[in-house]
C-alpha cells in the first residue's frame, strides 16, 4: 500500500476557500498520496481576538504534519494584528521563499515570452519582520534587522538551488550604496559564497536598477536572491509581467517544515463570485508534491494544467479574445484540468519531476563568529524635545555634568545639525545626540547610566539608547549626513 503524507490544509479568507476546493478536487482526482488535516486560520481567528490569526490547536496540527498548503488570508489593516504569513514563516523558521516566474506565451498575454526566472527571498528578517515603534508625537520607527547567519543561509540556498536545478546564474539585489551595514553584509556574503560556485555566474545590482531591469528585460535573469522586503515586491512584479499574478505559486522552506501558497492575496472584492483563478495555489501544490517526493503526481497535474492553458481554457483574469477559446469559472477550470490528466502539453515544456527529492546538502555554518574584538566607544541617545534649533539642545546638554562623555553631534533623521556653522531650523521633536568618551578609552555600561541620569535630572526625555561599537578597531555605526 502506498504511503500517504499528512498535509495541513488552511482554507484562508476571501477567495481562499474557492480556490482551495478546486485544488483539492484536482489532487484527489490525480490520486495524490496525501492525507489532509484542516485548520482554521486568518480572519475568523482575528475576529475571535487571536491577534496572531492562529490558535494553539492549529500549531499542534502543523507541528504534527510538517507541511502546510495554505490559501491566502486577510490581515486586518488596523493596529494590533500581526501578519499570519510572517508569523508562520518566522515561527517555523522557513528561511527560504522560492517564487518561480515563467511566461506561458503565446497562451497568456505577456510582453516577455522568454521569461523564466526564480526569485529566492530571505524569509525571516529585514523590515518585513514588522518591528515598529512610535517614539514621539511626530516620529515612527521600523527596525531593519539583518544577521550574518541569515545572509549565509539564504545565499547558500540560492546557489545550491541553482546547482540542483541546472541554472546558470545567480543575481543579488541590495541597496548597500545607502545601507552600508544591513544590505552591505548581504552583498559581502554573496560575494564570498559565489566564489565557492565557479560554475555558476554571479552578478549584483542595486535594487532600484535591478527592479527596473526586471520589469523591462526579465530575460536576463535566472535566479535572483534578495532580502525579505525587496523579494516581496519584485516577486509580484515578476508574477505580473509573466501574464498574471494569479498563476504564480510559492514555497517556503525550512529545515524541518515547509509551507506552500499562492503569491497573490485573498482578493475579497471577488470572493464568492466563483471567478478566481486557482492556478497560483495549484502551482504551489505542485511544488509541494515535488517537495514530498511525489514527482509523478506533480508532473501529471502540471502537464494537465499546461494543456488546459494551451487549449485556451482560461479564467476571467487571463481570458483574451485573441488567445482564449473558453472562459470558465473556478470550479469549471478545475474540471477542465482533471479532464486532461494524462495528457501532455504540445508547446509548453513538459514537466518530468523525480519521484525522490534530492535534499539540499547544507554547508551552512550556523555558529555565530565571536572572534572579532567588540569595544563600546560611544552611545547615541535619542531624545524627544520640540525645539527648532539643535544649538538650543547643545547649549542645554553642555551645561550638564555628563562625566567622561562629550557631546559630539546632534542630528535629526540622519542629518547633522550641530555643530554647524549654519543654524538650521527644522520642525522636529526627535533628535539623536551622539556622545563619545573624551579620552577614547572603552566605555562601561555604568557610564551610560550616569549619563542618562544627568539627562533625566535636566528633564530631557530620552526615548532610545543605541550603543556604538568598534569590531576589531573598525567603527560599526553610520555617520550622519554632513558628519
From Swiss-Prot:
Site (Critical for catalysis): 128, 175
Binding site for NADP(+): 74, 264-270, 277
One function term, GO molecular function aspect: magnesium ion binding
Alphabetical GO biological process terms: glyoxylate cycle; isocitrate metabolic process; tricarboxylic acid cycle
Disulfide bridge map: none
Amino acids binding Mg(2+): 232
Enzyme Commission code(s) on record: 1.1.1.42
Reaction(s) catalysed (UniProt annotation): D-threo-isocitrate + NADP(+) = 2-oxoglutarate + CO2 + NADPH
Matching InterPro entries: IsoCit/isopropylmalate_DH_CS, Isocitrate_DH_bac-typ, Isocitrate_DH_TT1725_C, Isocitrate_DH_TT1725_C_sf, IsoPropMal-DH-like_dom
Cofactor, free-text remark: Binds 1 Mg(2+) or Mn(2+) ion per subunit.
Pfam families: Iso_dh, Isocitrate_DH_C_bact
Keywords per UniProt: Glyoxylate bypass, Magnesium, Manganese, Metal-binding, NADP, Oxidoreductase, Tricarboxylic acid cycle
Cofactor names: Mg(2+); Mn(2+)
Binding site for D-threo-isocitrate: 83, 85, 89, 99, 121
EC top class named in words: oxidoreductase
UniProt record similarity statement: Belongs to the isocitrate and isopropylmalate dehydrogenases family.
Subunit (UniProt): Homodimer.
Role, per record: Catalyzes the oxidative decarboxylation of isocitrate to 2-oxoglutarate and carbon dioxide with the concomitant reduction of NADP(+).
Protein name, UniProt field: Isocitrate dehydrogenase [NADP]
Amino acid at each position: 500500500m502506498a504511503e500517504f503524507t499528512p498535509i495541513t490544509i488552511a482554507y484562508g479568507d476571501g477567495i481562499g476557500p474557492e480556490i482551495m476546493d478546486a485544488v483539492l478536487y484536482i489532487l484527489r482526482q490525480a490520486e495524490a498520496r496525501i492525507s489532509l488535516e484542516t485548520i482554521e486560520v486568518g480572519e475568523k481567528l482575528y475576529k475571535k481576538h487571536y491577534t496572531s490569526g492562529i490558535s494553539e490547536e492549529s500549531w499542534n496540527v502543523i507541528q504534527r504534519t510538517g507541511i502546510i498548503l495554505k490559501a491566502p488570508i486577510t490581515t486586518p489593516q488596523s493596529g494590533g494584528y500581526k501578519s499570519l504569513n510572517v508569523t508562520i514563516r518566522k515561527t517555523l523558521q522557513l528561511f527560504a521563499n522560492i517564487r518561480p516566474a515563467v511566461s506561458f506565451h503565446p497562451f497568456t498575454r505577456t510582453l516577455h515570452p522568454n521569461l523564466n526566472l526564480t526569485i529566492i527571498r530571505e524569509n525571516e528578517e529585514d523590515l518585513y519582520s514588522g518591528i515598529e515603534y512610535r517614539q514621539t508625537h511626530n516620529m515612527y520607527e521600523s527596525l531593519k534587522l539583518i544577521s550574518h547567519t541569515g545572509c549565509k543561509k539564504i545565499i547558500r540556498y540560492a546557489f545550491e538551488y541553482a546547482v540542483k536545478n541546472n541554472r546558470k546564474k545567480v543575481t543579488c539585489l541590495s541597496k548597500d550604496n545607502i545601507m552600508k551595514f544591513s544590505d552591505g553584509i548581504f552583498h559581502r556574503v554573496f560575494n564570498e559564497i559565489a566564489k565557492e560556485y565557479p560554475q555558476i555566474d554571479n552578478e549584483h545590482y542595486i535594487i532600484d536598477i535591478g527592479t527596473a531591469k526586471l520589469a523591462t528585460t526579465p530575460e536576463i535573469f535566472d535566479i535572483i536572491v534578495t532580502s525579505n522586503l525587496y523579494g516581496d515586491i519584485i516577486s509580484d512584479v515578476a508574477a505580473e509581467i509573466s501574464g498574471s499574478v494569479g498563476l504564480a505559486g510559492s514555497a517556503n522552506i525550512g529545515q524541518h517544515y515547509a509551507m506552500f501558497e499562492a503569491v497573490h492575496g485573498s482578493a475579497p472584492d471577488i470572493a464568492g463570485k466563483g471567478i478566481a483563478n486557482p492556478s497560483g495555489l495549484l502551482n504551489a501544490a505542485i511544488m509541494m508534491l515535488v517537495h514530498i517526493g511525489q514527482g509523478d503526481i506533480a508532473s501529471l497535474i502540471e502537464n494537465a494544467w499546461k494543456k488546459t492553458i494551451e487549449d485556451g481554457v482560461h479564467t476571467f483574469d487571463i481570458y483574451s479574445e485573441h488567445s482564449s477559446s473558453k472562459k470558465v469559472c473556478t470550479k469549471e477550470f478545475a474540471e477542465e484540468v482533471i479532464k486532461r490528466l494524462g495528457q501532455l502539453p504540445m508547446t509548453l515544456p513538459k514537466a518530468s519531476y523525480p519521484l525522490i527529492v534530492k535534499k539540499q546538502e547544507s554547508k551552512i555554518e550556523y555558529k555565530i563568529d565571536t572572534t572579532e574584538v567588540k569595544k563600546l566607544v560611544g552611545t547615541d541617545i535619542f531624545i524627544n524635545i520640540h525645539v527648532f534649533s539643535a544649538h538650543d539642545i547643545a547649549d542645554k546638554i553642555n551645561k550638564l555634568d555628563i562625566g567622561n562623555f562629550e557631546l559630539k553631534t546632534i542630528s535629526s533623521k540622519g542629518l547633522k545639525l550641530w555643530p554647524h556653522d549654519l543654524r538650521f531650523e527644522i520642525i522636529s521633536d526627535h533628535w539623536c545626540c551622539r556622545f563619545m568618551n573624551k579620552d577614547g578609552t572603552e566605555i562601561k555600561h555604568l557610564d551610560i547610566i550616569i549619563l542618562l541620569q544627568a539627562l533625566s535630572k535636566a528633564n530631557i526625555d530620552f526615548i532610545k539608547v543605541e550603543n556604538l561599537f568598534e569590531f576589531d578597531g573598525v567603527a560599526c555605526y553610520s555617520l550622519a549626513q554632513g558628519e
